[in-house]
Amino acid sequence: METATLVAISISCLLVSFTGYALYTAFGQPSEQLRDPFEDHED
């Protein structure tokens, strides 16, 4: 394969894996450790 194709595929895989990790952190099991700033402040 050409170099440009390999670079494009690797950047795409990196972006997809980063997005998957961000979604897992936001909505998966680690999200229980995140604090909610709206619940921290009482009006």
UniProtKB/Swiss-Prot annotation:
InterPro entries with a match to the protein in the record: PSII_PsbN
Transmembrane feature ranges: 5-27
GO biological process: photosynthesis
Gene Ontology cellular-component terms listed: chloroplast thylakoid membrane
Record flagged with keyword Cytoplasm: no
The keyword Transmembrane helix appears for this protein: yes
Topology relative to the membrane: Single-pass membrane protein
Domain of life: Eukaryota
UniProt entry keywords in alphabetical sequence: Chloroplast, Membrane, Plastid, Thylakoid, Transmembrane, Transmembrane helix
HAMAP family: PSII_PsbN
Protein name per its UniProtKB record: Protein PsbN
Organism of provenance: Cedrus deodara
Gene name linked to the record: psbN
